[in-house]
Amino acid sequence: MKLKVTVNGTAYDVDVDVDKSHENPMGTILFGGGTGGAPAPRAAGGAGAGKAGEGEIPAPLAGTVSKILVKEGDTVKAGQTVLVLEAMKMETEINAPTDGKVEKVLVKERDAVQGGQGLIKIG
């Protein structure tokens, strides 16, 4: 399996051997707005569980907003990094899933967010 990993702003292409005997029973987990199979199932709503609305880019995991790279009114392209989340001392780039215009930035830098919470609305 080939993966693209970004470390400290430098992108690397990585080959990974997959041990099929230890498949993840939770399904596919996507980070940084990547594409792939179905997203991992979400836990049943508990206190503070976030849920992105229509047109909103959801946080793929709980963390802290490190950088917001766009502002309302900006035009974005699919795959463009729009925000960076920090979780467990690792940065995760959040990419626009489609081309569009930033309608609303729903968070501020240093905000704590929950997995699934809407970050940016694109129309």
UniProtKB/Swiss-Prot annotation:
Q: Which GO terms describe its molecular function?
A: methylmalonyl-CoA carboxytransferase activity
Q: List residues modified as N6-biotinyllysine.
A: K89
UniProt keywords, alphabetically: Biotin, Transferase
- Mutagenesis / variant outcome for changing A87M: Reduces activity 10-fold
Tell me which InterPro entries the record gives.
Biotin_BS, Biotin_Carboxyl_Carrier/Decarb, Biotin_lipoyl, Single_hybrid_motif
EC number(s) in its UniProt entry?
2.1.3.1
Q: Which CDD domains match?
A: biotinyl_domain (cd06850)
The highest taxon in the source lineage is Bacteria
One Pfam family it belongs to:
Biotin_lipoyl
SUPFAM superfamilies registered for this protein in UniProt: Single hybrid motif
State the reactions this protein catalyses: (S)-methylmalonyl-CoA + pyruvate = propanoyl-CoA + oxaloacetate
Q: Tell me where in this chain the Biotinyl-binding domain is found.
A: 46-123
Give the result of M88 to A/C/T/L, as annotated.
Reduces activity at least 10-fold
Q: What does this protein do?
A: The biotinyl 1.3S subunit serves as a carboxyl carrier between the substrate-binding sites on the 12S and 5S subunits.
Partners and quaternary state? Transcarboxylase is composed of three subunits: 1.3S, 5S, and 12S. The core of the enzyme is composed of six 12S subunits. On each side of the core there are three pairs of 5S subunits. Each 5S dimer is attached to the core by two 1.3S subunits. Thus the total number of chains is 30 (6 + 12 + 12).
Identify this protein by name.
Methylmalonyl-CoA carboxyltransferase 1.3S subunit
Q: Which organism is it from?
A: Propionibacterium freudenreichii subsp. shermanii
